[in-house]
């Protein structure tokens, strides 16, 4: 059985303190059953790994929105210890430039040289210094 974790009634998100040690937890913050917003996290004993930080695409269900981002509660509740980006498609890296306030400077980002170049360009386009994650 997978334990379910929900936010405190006060809206405070502190998921990691509720999780048992020596148990691997994972969650999907998007990309399941639909195209876009690929985001998966793995958490074990205080270490959180994000795999992909993609954006979704606006459609007739989201009028007025330019992009969809991964689940906010997961992003804020589990800041990354490291990030792995599988490839450079927008649905796998597109949310990263919009989440720089959640991703601490110096957080290791592992990816291919080509994907790193794409991400660097997207960060610069938004006025963010990519050297924060070298």
Predicted regions: what they are:
Residues 1-27, 43-54, 115-134:
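Metallo-beta-lactamase
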Residues 13-16, 28-29, 37-38, 96:
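Generic recognition of flexible, low-complexity loop/linker segments
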Residues 25, 108, 132-134:
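Conserved beta-strand segments of alpha/beta enzyme cores
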Residues 32-37, 44-85, 94-107, 111-117, ...:
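Pre-active-site segment of Zn-dependent metallo-hydrolases
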Residues 91:
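Acidic Asp/Glu-based divalent-cation binding sites
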